[in-house]
Each structure stands twice: as C-alpha cells, then as structure tokens.
C-alpha cells in the first residue's frame, strides 16, 4: 500500500477546513512551480543556486516530489487568499491604515528579497 501526503488548512475566517490531495494523473517534481526564484530575476539573467536536485525513482524520492507538488498547491491557495484579502481591504494603497501597509511591505520585502528589518529602518 502506497501512502500519499495530504494537507489540511484551517483558519478562523473559513467555515470548514480546506483539504489538499494529489491527483493520480499529476506529474510530480522536486522543481516546484511556486518555490523557485521569481520570473523577474530569471528574465534579468538570475540563476537559482538553491534549485533542488531531481528526485530518485524510489519510495522516498517519490515522496519528496509529491511533497513539493503539495507545497505548490498550498502556496497557490494561500496566494489567492492574500489577493482576495488585499482586494477586500481596498487594495493595500487606497487610503487604508498606513502602518499596516508598511508592515505588509516589510513582510513582502523580507520574503521576496531577504532584506533584514534593520536594513530598512
């Protein structure tokens, strides 16, 4: 019997948990669609030096690839939730709470660029 990873996302603002399952006809790879460097960096000639190695055709290697696919599904879902939340709050720049906007900008820069908080101040 082959075990397949799944994930469940819960949050106070959603009625029922969101379940993530892998489909049987889905190709799995350790090169995730949402875990690589940004398209902007790639177009500028950047190189992903942290790119993972390909998975081996072993039970653990296949699990590694399945987990990467599952992570992609979660990342896409969470990105969509963030976009909806941003629209719900007026788009992030439409005269809302400036401090919250600054915090979100700081978080984005840290996550996207690896900028340290001390460097920004």
From Swiss-Prot:
Task: Tell me if Transcription regulation is a UniProt keyword of this record.
Answer: yes
User: By its UniProt entry, which InterPro entries does this protein fall under?
Assistant: EKC/KEOPS_Gon7
Skewed-composition ranges (Basic and acidic residues): 15-30, 100-112
For this entry, list what GO says about its biological process: tRNA processing
GO CC annotations on file = chromosome, telomeric region; nucleus
- Give the keywords, sorted: Activator, Chromosome, Nucleus, Telomere, Transcription, Transcription regulation, tRNA processing
Keyword Ubl conjugation appears in the UniProt entry = no
The segments labelled Disordered in the record are: 1-37, 86-121
Question: According to its UniProt record, where is this protein located?
Answer: Nucleus; Chromosome, Telomere
User: What's this protein's family per the entry?
Assistant: Belongs to the GON7 family.
Described by its record, this protein's role is as follows: Component of the EKC/KEOPS complex that is required for the formation of a threonylcarbamoyl group on adenosine at position 37 (t(6)A37) in tRNAs that read codons beginning with adenine. The complex is probably involved in the transfer of the threonylcarbamoyl moiety of threonylcarbamoyl-AMP (TC-AMP) to the N6 group of A37. GON7 likely plays a supporting role to the catalytic subunit KAE1 in the complex. The EKC/KEOPS complex also promotes both telomere uncapping and telomere elongation. The complex is required for efficient recruitment of transcriptional coactivators.
Oligomer and partners: Component of the EKC/KEOPS complex composed of at least BUD32, CGI121, GON7, KAE1 and PCC1; the whole complex dimerizes.
Name of this chain's protein: EKC/KEOPS complex subunit GON7
**Organism annotation:** Candida albicans (strain SC5314 / ATCC MYA-2876)
* Taxonomic path: Eukaryota, Fungi, Dikarya, Ascomycota, Saccharomycotina
